Amino acid sequence: MRSTLNFNSHWQFTKPGAAPVAVTLPHTWNAADGTDGGNDYFRGTCTYTKEFAAPAHADDEEVWLEFEGAAMTAVVTLNDQELTRHAGGYSTFRVNLTPALAAQNTLTVTVDNSANRTVYPQKADFTFYGGLYRDVHILIVPHSHFALDNHGAPALRVTPEVSDDLHSAAVTVKAACENTPDGTEVLFAIESVGEQTAAMHGG
């Protein structure tokens, strides 16, 4: 069973040339200079740091971190070990903390909203706000789980097909799974008003 924990509080934010300040996510460093109508707001690299104890989890569980948005590029480091890099300020991404997780941890997220020719959009009529401007969550999952690293997308793809007379429907479900032993079967059930109306399973 997956557990989701809010991870928005108790961050330290550092802007170049300034002392760290305590912030709660969501946060952007352009809250003031990005809303005055000019095009002179700060675009550069800033750092978010958080000290935290490892969340309670079983030996056969994994601990992941989910970012709903980091504008525009991000580097995630845990206990001085770089875990991932992400480009794209408007997409969710997740990272497995388990290999570097200790009892007490230092998490550093370096975020950069500088102009970048490899990250879109390139131009817009809005501010390219920098920061961790959406929620961050801890995810605790079994070792065998629906995939979390598919570019932030859900691991389930559901495609309905309704008959022309609207009397019947077929549903195709595809699941991306991680660390599943050979022969593993996934059971899907369709429920309506608390009652199961259909079920199927596949490898």
Whereabouts are the PLM-identified features?
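Extracellular glycan-recognition surfaces and repeat-rich motifs
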Residues: 11, 18-34
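Beta-strand-rich binding/interaction modules
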Residues: 76-78, 166-202
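Short, well-ordered turn and helix-capping elements at secondary-structure junctions
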Residues: 33, 82, 90, 160-162
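Accessory beta-strand-rich segments of carbohydrate-active enzymes
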Residues: 3-5, 9-16, 39, 43-149, ...
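Generic structural motif
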Residues: 9-11, 156-160, 191
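A short, sequence-level motif marking secondary-structure junctions
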Residues: 27-29, 89-91, 201-203
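Surface beta-strand/loop "capping" patches
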Residues: 143-179
